[in-house]
């Protein structure tokens, strides 16, 4: 199936049902009082993460999603049925952003996690809500409010523990083939990898981590060169980055310049991402003599001013891969659990929330005036009358 990691959709919550004007009319109860019911709330729209999905391609063709409208109220104080909520299934790792305001509504990082993205309309009030000691036969009602409408940008960001970073043909895909069961395409030309790939590295039955391989970066990627930097977002949730450096490039470029270019593009994309733990991994050491390997590696380290961990491997020959994977596994296990790292998320403010609260507060005073039950037969006593004048 084609990998699609971005899609734009429009979600529309259901409108609230209208309240009605009604009066109780039964035999021997000629003036039974108001009994118009409230409408039902409109259905809301939710996103839910599903681990069985791995692409957003469905939403390239299915862009409009609408929840059900609330039913209108009825007589006998019958409240309208609430509109059915709509749940849109998305892959785990999806981020929802309001396209119009740029507000990030939330990230869905766990299977089954739900996120409300459009609030259903508030129900209209029936005339029963407006009765009081001075308004015994109210003819007022309110209509339901419209449901919220949002244009959403969905971005799928892969969930992985380790992210591979480097130039095209640095050997990232070969690395992931050697340490996991993933089989990404490998060839002797740049940009063989066009979409991200995931692989699971198993140290033993109980210990494993996930590696993400993204298409290679080149100088000027931030300005659109090559495949650009759109795939760097898949590294945002990684806990550690492996910067793979080809010490024997086929185009005879300087490995130090290549490594600098990658770091610069990373910082242009996101300073926060550039601050993640990053290890330097020199690949293709089997193609040079040991003295040349040490010389070239030291040249890159000096050019970068590097002080972090350094590894020398050959992904093709599977040389020195076990020590690297063991150290990565040990490092990941020392990090706090992801749930502990999560920051408090801001509550999403929906369009009609303030209106709902104000409307309910405005009518609370009427509830306090109700001394009798709504179904009391002596609600409308004989010692008063209400005159209604109709005009054409």
UniProtKB/Swiss-Prot annotation:
For this protein, the record's Pfam families field holds:
GTP1_OBG, MMR_HSR1
What's an example Gene Ontology biological process for this entry? ribosome biogenesis
The primary location reported for this protein is cytoplasm
Similarity field: Belongs to the TRAFAC class OBG-HflX-like GTPase superfamily. OBG GTPase family.
Q: Can you say what this protein is called?
A: GTPase Obg
Q: Where in the cell is it found?
A: Cytoplasm
Q: Where does Mg(2+) bind?
A: 173, 193
Q: Where is this region: Disordered?
A: 121-146
Subunit arrangement? Monomer.
| Keyword annotations from UniProtKB, A to Z | Cytoplasm, GTP-binding, Hydrolase, Magnesium, Metal-binding, Nucleotide-binding
Single GO molecular-function term? GTPase activity
Q: Which residues form the Obg domain?
A: 1-159
Q: Which InterPro entries match?
A: G_OBG, GTP-bd, GTP-bd_Obg/CgtA, GTP1-OBG_CS, GTP1_OBG_dom, GTP1_OBG_dom_sf, OBG_GTPase, P-loop_NTPase
EC number(s) on file:
3.6.5.-
What the entry lists under CDD domains is as follows: Obg (cd01898)
Q: Which GO terms describe its cellular component?
A: cytoplasm
Provide the OBG-type G domain boundaries: 160-333
Q: Which cofactor does the UniProt annotation name?
A: Mg(2+)
């Amino acid at each position: 199936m084609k990998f699609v990691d971005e899609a734009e959709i429009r979600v529309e919550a259901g409108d609230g049902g209208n309240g009605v004007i009604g009066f109780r009319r039964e035999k021997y109860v000629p003036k039974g009082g108001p009994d118009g019911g409230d409408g039902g709330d409109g259905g809301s729209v939710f996103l839910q993460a599903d681990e069985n999905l791995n692409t957003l391609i469905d939403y390239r063709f299915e862009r409009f999603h609408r929840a059900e409208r609330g039913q209108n109220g009825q007589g006998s104080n019958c409240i309208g049925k609430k509109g059915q909520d709509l749940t849109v299934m998305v892959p785990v790792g999806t981020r929802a952003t309001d396209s119009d305001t740029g507000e990030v509504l939330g990230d869905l990082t766990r299977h089954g996690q739900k996120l409300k993205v459009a609030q259903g309309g508030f129900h209209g009030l029936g005339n029963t809500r407006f009765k009081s000691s001075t308004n015994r036969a109210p003819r007022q009602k309110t209509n339901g409010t419209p449901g919220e409408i949002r244009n959403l940008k969905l971005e799928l960001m892969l969930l992985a523990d380790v992210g591979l970073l480097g130039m095209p043909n640095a050997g990232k895909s070969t690395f992931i083939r050697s340490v996991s069961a993933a089989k990404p395409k490998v060839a002797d030309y740049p940009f063989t990898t066009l979409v991200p790939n995931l692989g699971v590295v198993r140290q033993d039955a109980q210990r494993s981590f996930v590696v993400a391989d993204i298409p290679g970066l080149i100088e000027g990627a931030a300005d659109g060169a090559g495949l650009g930097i759109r795939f760097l977002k898949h590294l945002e949730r990684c806990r550690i980055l492996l910067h793979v450096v080809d010490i024997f490039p086929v185009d005879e470029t300087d490995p130090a310049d290549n490594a600098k270019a990658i770091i610069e593009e990373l910082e242009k994309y996101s300073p926060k991402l550039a601050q993640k733990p990053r290890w330097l991994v020199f690949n293709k050491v089997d193609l040079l003599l040991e003295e040349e390997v040490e010389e070239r590696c030291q040249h890159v380290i000096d050019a970068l001013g590097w002080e972090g961990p350094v590894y020398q491997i050959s992904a093709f020959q599977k040389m020195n891969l076990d020590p690297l994977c063991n150290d990565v596994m040990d490092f990941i296990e020392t990090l706090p659990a992801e749930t502990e790292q999560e920051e408090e998320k801001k509550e999403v403010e929906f369009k009609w929330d303030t209106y709902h609260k104000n409307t309910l507060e405005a009518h609370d005073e009427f509830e306090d005036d109700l001394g009798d039950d709504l179904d009391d037969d002596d609600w409308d006593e004989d010692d008063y009358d209400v005159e209604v004048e109709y005009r054409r």
